[in-house]
Amino acid sequence: MTGIDTTKRARLEIAGWSVGDAAEFLGLTPEEAAFVELKLALASYLREVRGARGWTQVEVAGLLGSSQSRVAKMEAADPTVSVDLLVRSLLRLGATREDVGRVIARVA
């Protein structure tokens, strides 16, 4: 588990608290946790690309032939959004394969 110092963790455990991360709480396997992190990273990068180009969600939706609400779901890594859709959308918006590869590599 990361994100909490050992002293604070020990104090919480002594007080009767169980300390863990979201993956532990949800009972995710390491593979499932990695997939969730990958999807979140791609969604975040989509938001970053849109912001860097000064586009609104409506403008991105027009470029992708989609709706603003779908773009919002993509940026939020909604469960209805596939990794495939995120990657194809990033490429359509001008990201390179290398850009997408760097995002994926950061998760590993």
What residue spans do the PLM features occupy?
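DNA major-groove recognition helix of helix-turn-helix/homeodomain DNA-binding modules
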Residues: S82-R102
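Short alpha-helical DNA-recognition segment
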Residues: R53-K73
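Residue-level detection of the helix-turn-helix DNA-binding "recognition helix"
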Residues: G65, A76, A105
